[in-house]
Amino acid sequence: MKIEIAKDVLLSGIQKVQNVISARATLPILSNILVEAEQGKLKLTATDLDIGINCAIPVDIQEPGAITIPAKRFSDIIKELPDNSVSISTKKNNQITIETKSCQFKIMGLPYEDFPKLPEFKEGGVIKIEQSTLKEMLGLTSFAVSLDETRYILNGILFKINQNNLTLVATDGKRLAVIDRTLTQNTEKTLSIIVPLKTIQELNRNLQEEGEASILLGNNQVLFDLGSAVIISRLIEGEFPDYQPVVPPASENKISVYREQFLLAVRRAALLATPDYQAVKLEVFKNKLVVSKSTPDIGESREEVAIEYQGKEIVIGFNPTYLIDVLKNLKEEKIRFE
């Protein structure tokens, strides 16, 4: 293999794929990126056997070929190169030469034949959604995913597809996040899958503000084609808990508030929270919300926030982290809660 490529283009490609690589890889080959040069494209692939990601970037190919390169070393070298034009070539003994006009590195790789093959997906049953919409939906649910490994079924987000409706659900047992969006096409049947949190994080990292995402389902696997990258992941097996009985019916006590003002007030109150005294108190009066916090041996705070509300007075306590996670991910200037 022998190629010429711009440093910034190559570095961008490496950064797209290298995050899936585990720091505790069980096999040396899993610490490497598969680099394949063919048909005017450089294809970069990384996997930890549960999730795989690849991307293709433009390149000047003088000799096609393939090799696997240690990901961190590859990234560190490219990042520090002094020139923008980079030449990469390989020899039969898996030695890789990386050079610019004034700098040269020679490092060892591993044979591309040893790299695990990513699953192939049959065409058909593609679900399409705007990338910006999917990114918004993930932002409004991923914070509620459980990090408790003993509750494996909750370590991901439920994707529920019913005709032309996509619902995302996440819960850690203490809070529940649900969001619905309409798809541009109908699906033939109802589908439910649980996508692991690590895959969600990679999706969030690679989703763009423009363009479509295509979702394909395989045998206990899912593929997300984002155009600039393709992410393939195992799914979490099992049945997600029935969340609908947990969602309370509509309440007459509807409060409208400016999101940013409410967020900042909760953040300030949370400054006095401790592990033993976490709750922030919310007192709801007509057109006024009082956010307060009192912690023994620490201190207290009180702040008033203007709201639109004409109902009865309410006093309630919340873990401020749960409120902040929601408020910082919403985009609307004004929000309503019940």
Language-model features, listed with the residues they occupy:
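Structural preference for solvent-exposed beta-strand-turn elements
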Residues: 1-338
